[in-house]
Amino acid sequence: MHHLPCLLLIRHAQSENNALEDRFRVPDPGITELGVAQSKKLAMAMAKLAPTVVYCSPFLRSLETTRWIAKQTGAVPVVRQDIYEQGGCHSGFQAGRRIAQVGMNRETLSRQYAGWHLDERIGDEGWYDLDHFETADEARNRAHQVRKWYESESQMHSDRDRVAMVIHADFKLRLLEAFLEEDSIEEQLGDIVNTSISRLSLSKGRWRMDYWNVFSHLDPHEIST
């Protein structure tokens, strides 16, 4: 395996759904006023970490969080289709009644995030490619595919690269399970704070977690989960 840079896994800022009861949630919420404040603080922290590559989920809450990172660091984000939240884009909140939604399409993303790189899998209809609410097992399989892709990209990175992914709480857990080769990691870890940063690095052929859920860039009143 060629050199692989460390990987920063970042949860998006507080979304409008995070601040609402389940029954009021919408398929693709933006971020709240608190979320904007969190994003600004995150962006300042990321300027010090100086990521050279920033991948983000196609969900609006990740895109809006990433916009602040891009402004502060100058990195041009890459919107990847396959790092969305577990469950996918859907309406409804009750088990068995969730209906798949397609998410933003390529034209909308190109217009709202001009200059960003868009995954070729994001099409004219939208980015969510399943016709159902994604299961936990499907999300785990997807996380393993993301790991395989990241490791296959090793020859594309230099020793100076620092890679960040702006993603979601549940899929962050699935990625940790895939990279750390753990069956279930949820019970070992606490709540994931909005805009918290975790870092993975490769050592002697195995991935390790250098730190988890760091949110020291936030003031106490800005912390949310």
Model-derived segments and spans:
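Phosphate-coordination/substrate-recognition cap region in phosphate-metabolizing enzymes
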Residues: 42-119, 190
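Acidic, low-complexity terminal tails and accessory targeting/binding regions
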Residues: 1-6, 86-115, 155-161, 177-225
